[in-house]
Amino acid sequence: MSTLDRALTHSNNIGIDECEVVVIKKNITTVRITDSEIVEIKQNFDRNYGIRLIHQKKIASIQTTNKEKITGSIDEGLKMTLKLKSKEFWRGLPDKKETTHLEGTFDQKLKDISGSKAADIAQNMINSSENKKIDTITGSLNIVDEDFELCNSKGLNFNHKSTYISGIINAESEQDTLPVSGIGHACGRTLSKFSPEQIGDDAKNMCIGSINPQKINSGKYSIIFEPYSVGEILSFVVASNFNFKTLSEKKSCFSNNFKNKISADEFNLTDDPHIPEGIGTKAIDDEGVKTKKIKLIENGVFKNPIFY
C-alpha cells in the first residue's frame, strides 16, 4: 500500500468526513554566481506530504516530510478541528479526474540535466553580460523537476509532472561617481525556449544605460515598467489582495470593492493559467480541478477573486 493510500485508509478508519493527501517530489539544481564567476553548483532532492482534513465542515491542513509519521499527523489534524469554526461555504472535494493536457509544461531535457550542463548555461549568462564598463556580475540559475501526486477520499487520484527553469543576472558598475546596476531575468518551462544570452544582454544594457544618470525636472511623467518589475508588483503586491481567503476575512485592501471600480477604465488584469512557458501554467490545480482563465479586473472593475 502506498503512503497516500495508507493515509486515506487511516482517515476513513477514524471517521474523518473527507481527506486529501498530496506528495510533491522535487529535484532542484542551483548554480550560484558571485564576483563574475560560478562559485557553487548544488543538486537537492526533497519530498513533502500535505494533508487536508475536512470534518463537520471544519478544515485543517498539515505538512510533513516524514512518510512514517503521516498517520500520526492525521490524528493531530483531527484534534485541530475541535478548535476550528465550520466553513459553511464548503461543498466537498472534487471526485472527477480532469484530463486536459497543456503542451510545454514538462521537458525531459530539464529533468535529466546534469550539473555540468547547468553550469554551461550559467556561464553563457555571465559571458553575455560581460563588458569593460561592468565591474561585477552576480546571479543564479535554478532548475526544478517536480512530480506532484494527489489522492482524496472521493476517489480522485492524479499525477502531474512539471519542469521549471529560471535565471537572473545582476550587473554592477562603478565607472561613474554613482554606482549603478542592471537586472536580466527570464524563466520558463522548457530548455529550448530559455535564452541565457538574453538574460546577460538585458542586465548589461540596463547597467550601461544607467551610467551617468541625469536629473529631470519635477513634474508628472508616464512610467514604463520592465517585465521583471511588473512580475514583482503582481506577485508580491497585487496577487495577495485578490485571494478569496484574504478577501473573505476582510484583510484585503479590496475587501469592500468587489464588483466596484478600482482602477482606470483602460486597465485589465487576467489570471491565465494556460500561458505558454508560464511558471504558474497548469491544466489542473492542486485540488484536481480543471483550471480556467479568470478576469480579475475588467475595464477598471474588480470582477473576480483568485481561488488557491
Tell what function each PLM region has.
Residues M1-K282, D286-K292, E298-V301:
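Active-site bordering "gate/hinge" segments
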Residues F307-Y308:
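Transmembrane alpha-helix/helix-exit interface in multi-pass inner-membrane proteins
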